[in-house]
Amino acid sequence: NIFKNLIIFSSLLSFILSGDIRLGIDVFENEYIQLIRDKRIALLINHTSLNSEGKHIVDIVSENNLNLVKIFAPEHGYLGNHPAGQKIKNNVDPITGCEVVSLYGKNKAPTNSSMADIDVLIFDIQDIGVRYYTYISTLTLAMEKAAEHNVDFIVLDRPNPLSGKIEGSLLDEGYSSFVGMHPIPVRHGMTVGEIALLVKQNKWIRNSEDLKLKIIKIKDWDRSSLFHRYNKLWTPPSPNIPDLKTALIYVGLCLLEGTNVSEGRGTPSPFKLFGSPWLNSKKLILALNQYNFNGVVFSAEEFI
């Protein structure tokens, strides 16, 4: 019984230790925020830009009386409520009155005029660790503009929710696009901070040597752990990634976007469903289940 209790205690302790991480935004708030007090600040953020207590970075900046002059927002928008691929117009944050510049509309990179009144650009967005998830493309284009305009670029790092595990082939650079910009694996195993360092070190942007890049690192991140091991609330990074399981499935099932098969977007179970009116579901299920994928069973569903 003592041994059994020891195992249970050890397991609980492991869970607690895995959950006891400090996000980049937590470290920034406690240790670095005074360094930008006299700067003109722009934020590249969305609804996931929360500290460990659930407070949004805009509230943190406002409470510390920092000079916030502009907000940039990626695909899915500032509030994360726009569907994939939908172009988004510039608008205004109703709380601060600050301009919100869309980087998924007419332009995918900040314009020269939008960078003119900025001293420092802070990136704080939860990525999901997949090459074709566009937040890292937005990160790259913003880094390039920061280098061009001599603007400090700070990344508040966050865990890769899919851990540091790597899966999939490297991108053929001849097919580089906004949904696959760099020669990295599909499931790349990196944080956004590590991606930013890789981009700068490999000179994947123009004027990379001029970029003044600062990464505010996560503290006590165990890169072997999936997101559910941490004592953090899952905030859906986009409308069709409602939970961690969907993020894991997205790694492979998002490839169906390049075909005439639906991946279930807009349903209650995106990427857990796929299909088409012309598919013979019985034959397909029989064929897929013969692979005996660990933890996966295919069954017939109907959806619109």
What is each PLM-predicted segment?
Residues I21-L66:
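N-terminal phosphate-binding or glycine-rich loops at protein starts, especially the Walker A/P-loop
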Residues G80-G85, I154-S176:
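Glycine-rich, charge-decorated loop segments at or immediately adjacent to ligand/cofactor-binding or catalytic sites
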Residues V69-H76, L156:
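Short internal beta-strands
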Residues S10-G19:
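Hydrophobic h-region of N-terminal signal peptides that target proteins for export
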Residues I88-I118, V130:
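Glycine-rich oxoanion-binding loops at beta->alpha junctions
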Residues G24-V27, Y32, I45, M181-G295, ...:
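C-terminal and late-domain segments of enzyme folds
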Residues D127-L139:
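Glycine/threonine-rich flexible loop motifs
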